[in-house]
Amino acid sequence: VQYIVVKIGNEQYGIDIKYIDNIVRSQNITRVPKTQPYYKGVINLRGEICPIMSMRLKLGLEPDELTDKTRFIIVKVEGASIGVIVDQVKEVVTLEEEDIERISRSTNDDAAANYINAIGKKDGELISLLDIVSLIVENN
């Protein structure tokens, strides 16, 4: 399975490539009033309105600082597109089944743990594999 490895805060996360529609540089976000704090607003993506979500806030981390490495990853889930803000896109990795260790849902208070469904091992590094569907569909 191929994953895009991204950096969010100090951690590396993997997003299954089958959900990724596009990766774009950060751009102006139009705020939308009365929405969840992690919902940053919308952008105009080739004439389409695309909502943007802060992965940092959703995962219980410090608010985003947009830099020249910041990217919006446009994911398509259940027919809808949504952009997620990541601090950096690192690489594409291919993980074999034996490189992936499934983990059960956490019952602790760590927000990030609720959205990680496996840990991938690549060249001695650990990559938390995000359950991007539950991350986006929940509460939206």
Give the residues covered by each predicted segment.
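An acidic, low-aromatic, low-complexity terminal/linker signal
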Residues: 1-140
